[in-house]
Every structure is written in C-alpha cells, then in structure tokens.
Amino acid sequence: MREAVIAKVSTQLSEVVGVIERHLEPTLLAVHLYGSAVDGGLKPHSDIDLLVTVTVRLDETTRRALINDLLETSASPGESEILRAVEVTIVVHDDIIPWRYPAKRELQFGEWQRNDILAGIFEPATIDIDLAILLTKAREHSVALVGPAAEELFDPVPEQDLFEALNETLTLWNSPPDWAGDERNVVLTLSRIWYSAVTGKIAPKDVAADWAMERLPAQYQPVILEARQAYLGQEDRLASRADQLEEFVHYVKGEITKVVGK
C-alpha cells in the first residue's frame, strides 16, 4: 500500500529531492518522507511532507535559491493536475540531536508562503515547538529517501515535550477569526491533537476523525463528519456551521486540556 502511494508521486518526489540535493548535497545527512504518503495514504488535498537534516546552517544565498527552486516543484491543492503541495522542513543535526525542547528549525517551505516568496520575503530560522510533533511522526512512520532511518537518526521525543507542543498549539484557536477560511484543517488538527493527547501516538487525519467521532457528544458529530468528508474530496461546507464549529472547537480544546494540563 505504502509503496503504491509513493509510486503515484514518484516523479514529483524525484524532482523535489533533486532540488534539495543540488543545493544541499555537501551538508545533506538525510531526507525523510513522512505524513500521508506513508501513513494512511494521500488524500485529494494532502501535501508531500519531507524532513531534511543537514550538518550546518544555510547561508542566505542558499536559502533563497533553494526556496525559489522548490516553488517550481509545488502547487496549491487543486491548482495542478500533476503537482501536489510540497512541505519541506529543514533542521540542523546539532540543533535537534541530542533532543531538546523547544528545538530550532532552520527552514520551512510550504504553499502558504508562496505570495511572500514571490514578494522576496523569506522566513528565517526560528524556534519551532511543532518539531516535537513532526519528529514523533517521522520516527513512527517515514521512509528514508536519503540517509538512515528516522528512528536511528533522531532521539525519541519525551512524552512531556510532545504534550507541551500539543498544548501550545491549542493557543492558536480562540475565536472564529482564528479559523476562518481554514475550518476543515482546524477541525481535523484538533481531532489529531486530542487523539495524540490520549494515546501518545500520531494518527492520519481521517483515522483521528473517526476516533474523535466516537467520543464526541451528538451535537458536535456533524462538524467532524463534514470535515472528514471534505478531507476525502467532497464539498467543504463547514463555514455554514459557524455556531456549531465554535462550540466544537471549545469543547475539544477542553477535552485536550484535561489530558495535557494548563
């Protein structure tokens, strides 16, 4: 199953890895494919997720050239018949090994940055709490396209650090403007956080949605059902459930907080 999914995006994947190798090869330690491509299967709007590990920081010339070339290998969901959205996260080996929280991210590329990149705005290296979640994902489910397996290269992320990252993520969503235009993703992400808080594991979005559905009061189930169906390619109508959506967000945040604290 996993090999078949990867085969469907092999051409694009080869192009992306080729760009990475061309710009980073002297310092490149590893490239790991993680996310939907290797866990649960690519859905209509799924990204191709890559974690790249290098030995040294990127100079500004390399950063800009790499990002500009990655832009040519990626497309926003629904805008291309042959290209998927690509998300590339780059870390420096000594910033994450040995593990410490929060860890530093050297670079991240994604379609949400396209307009900024075209305007000449490039995100610098930064502390990223999400690396605790990302590295947990990579250690659980990934394929090494370059270098050793993720579970061999990366230290395990302690559960308390994973919980801290999950808890910090909850602060992003407090009122409707925080999820306007991104309703589906927020609903599914909250379901995944809830799943991870309870189980200590990372699940595909649709699997986490099914898990959450079984635990939700009946009045919130239509919200997650709409999000799941939209994720699988049906029409996204979540914006029409504004009141239910707000109640859902606050309910699930409350359930997560019971587990992870604060």
UniProtKB/Swiss-Prot annotation:
Effect of substituting residue 15 to Q: In plasmid pBP201
Keyword ATP-binding: yes
Reaction equation(s) it catalyzes: streptomycin + ATP = 3''-O-adenylylstreptomycin + diphosphate; spectinomycin + ATP = 9-O-adenylylspectinomycin + diphosphate
EC number: 2.7.7.47
InterPro entries: AadA/Aad9, AadA_C, NT_sf, Polymerase_NTP_transf_dom
Cysteines joined through disulfide linkages: none
Keywords carried by this UniProt record: Antibiotic resistance, ATP-binding, Nucleotide-binding, Nucleotidyltransferase, Plasmid, Transferase, Transposable element
Top-level division of the source organism's lineage: Bacteria
Name of the protein described by the UniProt record: Aminoglycoside (3'') (9) adenylyltransferase
Organism: Klebsiella pneumoniae
Gene this protein is translated from: aadA
